[in-house]
Every structure is written in C-alpha cells, then in structure tokens.
Amino acid sequence: MRDKKTSYIRLLHASPKAPAVDVYANGDNILADDLSYGEFTPYLPVMPGTYTIDIYPADNSDTPILTKELVLPEKTIATIAAIGELPELELFIVEDPKEPLQPNTSKIRFVHLSPDAPAVDVIEPNGSILFKDVSYKDITDYLSITPDTYTVEIAPTGTDNSVLFVPNIRLLPDAFYSLYAIGLVEGDPYLQLLIPLDGNSYIET
C-alpha cells in the first residue's frame, strides 16, 4: 500500500542529438537506465521531497551532463523531461493535474519542446485550430474533445506552412493525453509528435 503522500513521475528524453542517458536521484538511486531520445519511462512512485538529479551518458558515470535540484510536492503526477540542446540541457516539469473529465470524452493538450521551433498552431485538416500561438516550453490547458481518430498539422503561428503532419491519432474515451512536440525544425532529428497517455488518466493520488 502506497503512502498517501506518494507522487508519481516519469522521465522523458527530449534533448535532440543527446546520447542515451542514465538518470540518478540523490547519488545512487537509478531512475532510468539507457533512456534513448524520444523515450519515456513508466511512472515511478516516489516520496515528495528535494532530489538531486544527475544525468549521465548511458554506461558512463564519470561526469554528469546535467546536475539539477528538483523539489517534488506530495501527491504530484508529472513528466520530467530533459530538454534543450547540449550543453544547455535542462529539466522541464510537466504536471498532470487532476481535473474533471466528462464521461465518454477525452482531454488533450499541447507541450512545445522543440528548441528551434517558433510559436506554432496545432490545426485540424478542416482549418480548425486546436491550440494557437504555443511557444517553446509552453504547456496548454487541456481541451475536451470527442474520442475519435484525428489528424493534425503543426504550423508556425498565423501561417499555413505546415512543418509536421500527424495522421491517425486515436483518442480513447475517459483519458488524458499530451501532444509533445520534440525534435528540430532545422536539422536532425526532425520534428515529431509523441502522444502518451497521461498518468492522471489512471493514477490515484
């Protein structure tokens, strides 16, 4: 049985061109082993408190590429993303808030983690704008939407110059999703959209 104060975190490697990494908390507690770009860990139960996070290249614990202190409140559900381009790596926290969800609906939001992309709009093929003028490191509010299969395009705000086309996004009922834009508009790895199920869909705190 979990402590009533338990929090839950997952890690996301969203730093373009960075190698696979190992992530440690408070010295020797490993949170992620050989986490590659674009990958998430499962949600991990952790106690609230202050943590020192060290990120190393996978299988090389000589010198961390990032050391950061992280304060985690109790009963939090969150994704902790490694973002930015080396050597300006940083940790970015995306909390999964508990909020009402009407039966047989889904909720989606957009998280802009592409370091060289301008502010963007997320658009449906019919021209309907789901999210508008979202800048790097912005997290939108959740939007209620009918469960279905969707196609979206991402374009610099105010233009129809699509930089990413994503078909066949299947949204199930009674669930929360985040659309994470990662990668680079100019260069490799190119811009892509990660669409995980958020922990607030099924984790009780």
Regions found by a protein language model. Name each.
Residues 1-205:
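Intrinsically disordered, low-complexity polar regions and short flexible loop motifs
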